[in-house]
């Protein structure tokens, strides 16, 4: 079955204190999500540590991402993408707090052996 959508048109109608996750595709070994962030910060010392590789595109907005072991945050702007290997510990240190929100497209997939 053919499925369609629009990341920007289908955004939540208001700002949220937490991130809003929408799964667009979920197949064995592959998950694609739209993530909407407004003022999202992962506290110091807490990290995402995922079993899958994650390719992330910043569709709209702006964000800062910290990779464990790096001394500086990475500033991400619209159109920037990053590939995070499985178990690459990372955290979001800042996203915009005003409208439009920060919109991410995240593709999670099984790492190569």
How would you label these PLM feature ranges?
Residues 77, 86-113:
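Ligand-binding loop in jelly-roll beta-barrel domains
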Residues 28-30, 38-42, 60-64, 88, ...:
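Short, charged/polar surface micro-motifs in flexible loops or helix N-caps
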Residues 48-50, 55-78, 93:
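A short beta-strand-loop-beta hairpin characteristic of the jelly-roll/cupin
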Residues 29, 70, 97-99:
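Short strand-connecting beta-turns/loops that link adjacent beta-strands
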Residues 20-22, 62, 79, 89:
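Short, acidic/polar N-cap/turn motifs at the starts of alpha helices
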Residues 1-47:
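A short, N-terminal "cap"/entry segment at the start of jelly-roll beta-barrel domains
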